[in-house]
Amino acid sequence: MTDVYQHIECRWCHGQSPATSTSCDRCGAPLDIRDSVTEGGWRQAPQIRDLTEIQSGSSVYQLDGTVVPIAEVNLGEGERVFFEHHVMLWKDEHTAMSVMDMPGGAKRILAGMPFVLSVATGPGRVAFSRDAPGEIVMLPIDPGVRLHVREHAMIVASANLGYSFEKVQGLKAMLAAGTGMYLDSFTAGDQPGLLVLHGYGNVFERTLAEGETVQVEPGGFLYKDAAVTFDISTQKLDTGGGQGLQAAKGLASRGFAGLKAARSLMKGGDGLAGVLSSGGLQTAAAALTGPGITLMRLTGPGRVGIQSMYMEHGAA
């Protein structure tokens, strides 16, 4: 039997495993993960079983928990990981700790980003948690690959990954994209690295072909390959409300009492009752008078990762 039949390639991380394996030896993902996709092309991030050992260098990573999961790292001698200090849950007493200065400190402070990162050096164990419901995913990054990630989504990363940030271009994109002023950027050099992210809700991924686009709710964006570009588009809404819509606008201008009447008027007709009942005066007025909804338009080629629970910039 030739070598090609003795191994199977993981479609998630492209690692090679024996043909009889049911999960990837490198990242722990089920080897048939690409067989389970929606008609829209999305697949759920690999459901790595609790306490599955994932090797990166001489360190071992494990995930545990469901509602608020944790990532535990058993660091090899001299191996390091970096992270934001507030996500560390516990560590062995002898695990060495230090800090790593980040370039552009003043800009990062103004943008609400950390200007120093914590570093743990092995040997020893250290565990991390976002202290929020969601899902933790492990993303192997191959040499030469660069990944853009939503601010504050990183849980921990192997120290052989280059970490920087890239400014979101354009005022409209910065204000509307929901990602803040910057995107985190992670790059693998000569050696592969491992990036651990937290997504609110569940995490899904789709691979876009060259020139293929998808429009995403800005709060749902989590990560993308660097080759994937994005801009902001406004989708105009046709309410079909006619005179009823104009009457609702007039009622909404009268304050909360008017909003209640507007809600009754619009209920079942224009789909805005839920907004009126939960969004408050400002949101309701914007919904009634605004030109449309803002979406993040991503264009391939490359991977796009989303989280199913929308989070505004700055939420943690």
Roles of regions detected by a PLM:
Residues 3, 7, 11-21, 25-316:
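Composition-driven recognition of glycine/serine/threonine/acidic- and proline-rich low-complexity segments
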